[in-house]
Amino acid sequence: MSRRGTTEEKTAKSDPIYRNRLVNMLVNRILKHGKKSLAYQIIYRAVKKIQQKTETNPLSVLRQAIRGVTPDIAVKARRVGGSTHQVPIEIGSTQGKALAIRWLLWASRKRPGRNMAFKLSSELVDAAKGSGDAIRKKEETHRMAEANRAFAHFR
């Protein structure tokens, strides 16, 4: 048995303006080369663009987008008897949110457009409406898990 003590799970801090943990998770995920102030600028500009596009509370659009992209189940490669199987596993809420944020940023980087704030705001609005590449990625993951349901006993 390990002698190392159990670590406490870190709670995400909230950002200075909106006091929202999801915004802070998004900032930390978009961060490159330690330039956090630039990451905050991108997120806040995207939030302003969402406000202009939808004329509703941008944080509710963000919550709705993340809720729509969050997967319930994913597949994990597991090697059994010389062959690798894609085994479906259930995902917890924290890991699901992290995956959703990662997929939203991946989809917004892939979009053609002017700047990251514009692309991110467009992707968030689309995800809140139930369309966009991030939603497609979630559906693809769920389809993979459904197709490999026979391997669920390898968990």
Curated annotation (Swiss-Prot):
CC per GO annotation:
chloroplast; small ribosomal subunit
State a single Pfam family of this protein: Ribosomal_S7
Among CDD domains, the record links this protein to: uS7_Chloroplast
Keywords in alphabetical order: Chloroplast, Plastid, Ribonucleoprotein, Ribosomal protein, RNA-binding, rRNA-binding
What the entry lists under SUPFAM superfamilies is as follows:
Ribosomal protein S7
Can the keyword Chloroplast be found in this entry's annotation? yes
**UniProt record similarity statement:** Belongs to the universal ribosomal protein uS7 family.
Task: Share what the entry says about its subunit structure, partners included.
Answer: Part of the 30S ribosomal subunit.
For this protein's source organism, the top of the classification is: Eukaryota, Viridiplantae, Streptophyta, Embryophyta, Tracheophyta
Q: Which Gene3D superfamilies match?
A: Ribosomal protein S7 domain (1.10.455.10)
Domain of life assignment: Eukaryota
Q: Where in the cell is it found?
A: Plastid, Chloroplast
Q: Please give the PROSITE patterns that the UniProt record associates with this protein.
A: RIBOSOMAL_S7 (PS00052)
Q: Signal sequence span per UniProt?
A: none
Q: What is this protein called?
A: Small ribosomal subunit protein uS7c
Q: Which gene encodes it?
A: rps7
- PANTHER family per UniProt: RIBOSOMAL PROTEIN S7
Q: What does this protein do?
A: One of the primary rRNA binding proteins, it binds directly to 16S rRNA where it nucleates assembly of the head domain of the 30S subunit.
Keyword Plastid tagged: yes
Give the principal location in a single coarse category: plastid
Molecular function in Gene Ontology: rRNA binding; structural constituent of ribosome
Q: Which GO terms describe its biological process?
A: translation
